[in-house]
Amino acid sequence: MKWEISKTFRFEAGHRVWKQNLTYGRGAQFTKEKPVNKCVNLHGHSYVLEVTVGSDTLSEQDMVMDFYHVKNALKGLIEEIDHSFIIDVNDPMYPELKDVAEKYGAMKIFPVEFCPTAEALAKFFYDFLKKRLEEAGLLGEVKVVKVVLWETATSKAEYKEE
């Protein structure tokens, strides 16, 4: 891409990485003591999402795309996910948390069909924005270059298609 622009969003959300087990899998060989699987607990983050779109050409306004339009392409999703609890519908806790949310209105549930790790959420936002560009007839002119999702100040995940 000759030109790229990035737009940053912030939102608060909870999640649970129900598949986390630090005793095996990639990287387990670096663990010397018995690890604590903290991310299986219900917890939250102040997420920072950065989306980058690009093009080999500029519009008649000399832009890849106006930042205003990038913001509006994601605005509805960001509003929906903000202050929600992101949970995999396959998580064993999902039925009970859904019942609690419905019974008491105490929790805004955002169900997904994947374990909501930072990596999986980055791909989720990438796919969502790509679909929005396609629906608008812009996908040939503008491409989603990458999505970066910061879960904490020191931990991020990045997704891009090759």
From Swiss-Prot:
A GO biological-process term: queuosine biosynthetic process
Binding-site residues, Zn(2+): H15, H43, H45
EC number in record: 4.1.2.50
Family per similarity comment: Belongs to the PTPS family. QueD subfamily.
Signal peptide positions on this chain: none
Annotated protein name in UniProt: 6-carboxy-5,6,7,8-tetrahydropterin synthase
Summary of the function given for this chain in its UniProt record: Catalyzes the conversion of 7,8-dihydroneopterin triphosphate (H2NTP) to 6-carboxy-5,6,7,8-tetrahydropterin (CPH4) and acetaldehyde.
UniProt-annotated catalytic positions: C39, H83, E151
GO MF entry, a single one: 6-carboxytetrahydropterin synthase activity
Pathways involved: Purine metabolism; 7-cyano-7-deazaguanine biosynthesis
Swiss-Prot/TrEMBL catalytic activity: 7,8-dihydroneopterin 3'-triphosphate + H2O = 6-carboxy-5,6,7,8-tetrahydropterin + triphosphate + acetaldehyde + 2 H(+)
UniProt keywords, alphabetically: Lyase, Metal-binding, Queuosine biosynthesis, Zinc
UniProt cross-references to Gene3D superfamilies, sorted A to Z: 6-pyruvoyl tetrahydropterin synthase/QueD
Annotated source species: Aquifex aeolicus (strain VF5)
Cofactor note: Binds 1 zinc ion per subunit.
